[in-house]
Amino acid sequence: MLGYFESILPYTNGGKLPYWLLFISVVSIFNSVQTYQNINLTKRVYEKNPNQVSPLSARTFGTWTLITSIVRFYGAYYLQNKQIYELTQFTFAIAAWHFLSEWLYFGTCKLGKGLSGPLIVSSVSLVWMYLQKDFYVN
């Protein structure tokens, strides 16, 4: 059984970034699914102004999350491809921009549990990918 799981994991070239991207991709799929079932977790992210979160906006957020999880999944397996690498990196840049602008400009988020996770994941991933590009891209 362990051999099967090892056979489907991405090639890492000795690094950990592909595993991280795969993990974040899978977690994002679950986050996306929950936005279609209940808007309460989405309201936690935008907790400074949760009345702006509607079922439609939550589903749109979930769809956006699903699209980025697919890109990140491909990124986990094809980091040696410059275009895939950069596209994956852009998903984190856009996520960081979105959450920072919602917090600092639009005022729908506040620094707390709901915002900390997305901010940490997007910013750490973005910096990690910036620093490791030459290691992975052929």
Curated annotation (Swiss-Prot):
How is this protein organized at the quaternary level?
Heterotetramer of ERG25, ERG26, ERG27 and ERG28. ERG28 acts as a scaffold to tether ERG27 and other 4,4-demethylation-related enzymes, forming a demethylation enzyme complex, in the endoplasmic reticulum. Interacts with ERG25, ERG26 and ERG27. Also interacts with ERG1, ERG3, ERG5, ERG6 and ERG11.
Cellular component GO terms held in the UniProt record: endoplasmic reticulum; endoplasmic reticulum membrane
Q: Could you tell me which species this protein originates from?
A: Candida albicans (strain SC5314 / ATCC MYA-2876) (Yeast)
Example GO molecular function term? protein-macromolecule adaptor activity
Query: What is this entry's stated membrane topology?
Result: Multi-pass membrane protein
Function of the protein:
Part of the third module of ergosterol biosynthesis pathway that includes the late steps of the pathway. The third module or late pathway involves the ergosterol synthesis itself through consecutive reactions that mainly occur in the endoplasmic reticulum (ER) membrane. Firstly, the squalene synthase ERG9 catalyzes the condensation of 2 farnesyl pyrophosphate moieties to form squalene, which is the precursor of all steroids.
Q: Keywords of this protein's UniProt record, alphabetized? A: Endoplasmic reticulum, Glycoprotein, Lipid biosynthesis, Lipid metabolism, Membrane, Steroid biosynthesis, Steroid metabolism, Sterol biosynthesis, Sterol metabolism, Transmembrane, Transmembrane helix
Q: What is the lineage of its organism?
A: Eukaryota, Fungi, Dikarya, Ascomycota, Saccharomycotina
Glycosylation sites per record = N40
Keyword field contains Ligase: no
Where is this protein localized, as stated in its record?
Endoplasmic reticulum membrane
Q: What is its main location?
A: endoplasmic reticulum
What protein is this chain from? Ergosterol biosynthetic protein 28
